[in-house]
């Protein structure tokens, strides 16, 4: 439907509105829907019709349609009949027609202010009416008090204007146009209650929600960045020496920092690894010391170590009881805490017991030398022990030119030397076995015994 229009009166056309937008309001008497022509005394009034072929007389029919969309508060105004008009009503209608002309002249401006879309199904949206004025439409069973004795209009007129529930009387168009400034409000993003939101409102709501999400994400990213930079500044102010940290201090720090935000998780991880390694090493050491270990887990190792310590304490208590029960005159027992002299004597006695083996002091020294293949010899020597005997014996063999390749030497309960193979290094002369035996006896302190 074309939204552009112009009023035509008896004298001629009115000037163009909005820079030459052509009007399409033309009189077409052949397409009148109603068979009731206007009275002869009102021929000078303006007539108009829509492009769809619906002629209306503003003095009778348009007033009837527009009165149903206005909530009138004046109950004292007389009810106008569509076909019986007096002089007062004619004068009032002429004033209304002038206001209608001024309203339709500013139609394009109102449309631009309201941002009404061009594609709609409501006929009067082209005039800039809100959805609140045109939300309700006529129905077949609804009849307003203003349409009395004119049933043909309700059945043939299309649904242009709503029928308010509280319309009880007739009023002029001046309240409608005077309240028009109050109706012109900025377009809200959210739809009003009871009506579906338009496509523009949905898109505006989506843009607003997306912008709010972007603002929230930017603010959260800035907060994370600032917290990260603050942590870096805190950690960069001091030098951390990880190698100098011990396990006790790490445990103390972890206990004190409970419930607080950890700045360096790597430091705590390294400290925990060192603590566990030290604990495992000590458990292995304890397991090697304790003789009886039932299982290899930590609980078993600790339990067996505790049992072993209890056993040692019991043995110590038994020894104390035995010492207290024996008389002090007994010379067979040593004191509980021996002196260094007695301790060294006991060590020597344990190393060289006098009664376990016969002493070589009562025996003659023995030296045996046997020749083997080539220039190799086999030497067996046994004598009493004295300080420096091993060193003097090895020097004597070296002076004789013998290279000892395999030998066994024992200083337990005497001096015993078994040389399994010794070769002569000097090629010009050979050393005889008797000569080797005499040199070894002389070294042992038994010169002349051959």
From Swiss-Prot:
Residues 263-312 form the bHLH domain. Residues 378-450 form the ACT domain. GO terms for molecular function: DNA-binding transcription factor activity; protein dimerization activity; transcription cis-regulatory region binding. Expressed constitutively in roots, leaves, stems, and flowers. Broad expression within stomatal cell lineages of leaf epidermis, except in mature guard-cells. Its main location: nucleus. Disruption phenotype: The ice1-2 scrm2-1 double mutant lacks stomata so that the epidermis only contains pavement cells. Keywords: Developmental protein, DNA-binding, Nucleus, Transcription, Transcription regulation. InterPro entries: ACT_dom, bHLH-TF_ACT-like_plant, bHLH_dom, HLH_DNA-bd_sf, TF_AMS/ICE1/BHLH6-like. SMART domains: HLH. It comes from the Eukaryota. SUPFAM superfamilies: HLH, helix-loop-helix DNA-binding domain. PROSITE patterns: ACT (PS51671), BHLH (PS50888). It is found in: Nucleus. It holds the Pfam family HLH. One of its GO terms (biological process) is response to freezing. CDD domains: ACT_UUR-ACR-like (cd04873), bHLH_AtAMS_like (cd11443). Mediates stomatal differentiation in the epidermis probably by controlling successive roles of SPCH, MUTE, and FAMA. Functions as a dimer with SPCH during stomatal initiation. Homodimer. Heterodimers with SPCH, MUTE, and FAMA. This is Transcription factor SCREAM2. It comes from Arabidopsis thaliana (Mouse-ear cress).
């Amino acid at each position: 439907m074309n939204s552009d229009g112009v009023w035509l009166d008896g004298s001629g056309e009115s000037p163009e509105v909005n820079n030459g937008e052509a009007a399409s309001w033309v009189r077409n008497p052949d397409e009148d829907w109603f068979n009731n022509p206007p009275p002869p005394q009102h021929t000078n009034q303006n007539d108009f019709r829509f492009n769809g072929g619906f002629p209306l007389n503003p003095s009778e029919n348009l007033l009837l349609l527009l009165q149903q969309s206005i909530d009138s508060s004046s109950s004292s105004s007389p009810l106008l009949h569509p076909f019986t008009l007096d002089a007062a009503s004619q004068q009032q209608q002429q004033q209304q027609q002038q206001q209608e002309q001024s309203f339709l002249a500013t139609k394009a401006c109102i449309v631009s202010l309201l941002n009404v879309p061009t594609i709609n199904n409501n006929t009067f949206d082209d005039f800039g009416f809100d959805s609140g004025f045109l939300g309700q439409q006529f129905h077949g069973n609804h009849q307003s008090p203003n349409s009395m004795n004119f049933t043909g209009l309700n059945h043939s007129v299309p649904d242009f204007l709503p029928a308010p529930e509280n319309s009880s009387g007739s009023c002029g168009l001046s309240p409608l146009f005077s309240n028009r400034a109050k109706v012109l409000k900025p377009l809200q993003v959210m739809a009003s209650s009871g009506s579906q939101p338009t496509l523009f409102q949905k898109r505006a709501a989506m843009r607003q929600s997306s912008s709010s999400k972007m603002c929230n994400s930017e603010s959260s990213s800035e907060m994370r960045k600032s917290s990260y930079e603050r942590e870096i500044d805190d950690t960069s102010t001091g030098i951390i020496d990880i190698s100098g940290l011990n396990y006790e201090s790490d445990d103390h720090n972890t206990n004190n920092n409970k419930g607080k935000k950890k700045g360096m998780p790597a430091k705590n991880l390294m400290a925990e690894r060192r603590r566990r390694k030290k604990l495992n090493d000590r458990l292995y050491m304890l397991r090697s010391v304790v003789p009886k270990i039932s299982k290899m887990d930590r609980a078993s190792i600790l339990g067996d170590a505790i049992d072993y310590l209890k056993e040692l304490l019991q043995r110590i208590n038994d020894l104390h009881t035995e010492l207290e029960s024996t008389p002090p005159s007994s010379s067979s027992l040593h004191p509980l805490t021996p002196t260094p002299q007695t301790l060294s004597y006991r060590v020597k006695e344990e190393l060289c017991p006098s009664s376990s083996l016969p002493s070589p002091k009562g025996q003659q020294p023995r030296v045996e030398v046997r020749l083997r293949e080539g220039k190799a010899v086999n030497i067996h020597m046994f004598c009493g022990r004295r300080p420096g005997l091993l060193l003097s014996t090895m020097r004597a063999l070296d002076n004789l030119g013998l290279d000892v390749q395999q030998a066994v030497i024992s200083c337990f309960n005497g001096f015993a030397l078994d040389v399994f193979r010794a070769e002569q290094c000097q090629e010009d002369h050979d050393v005889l076995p008797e000569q080797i035996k005499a040199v070894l006896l002389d070294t042992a302190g038994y010169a002349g015994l051959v």
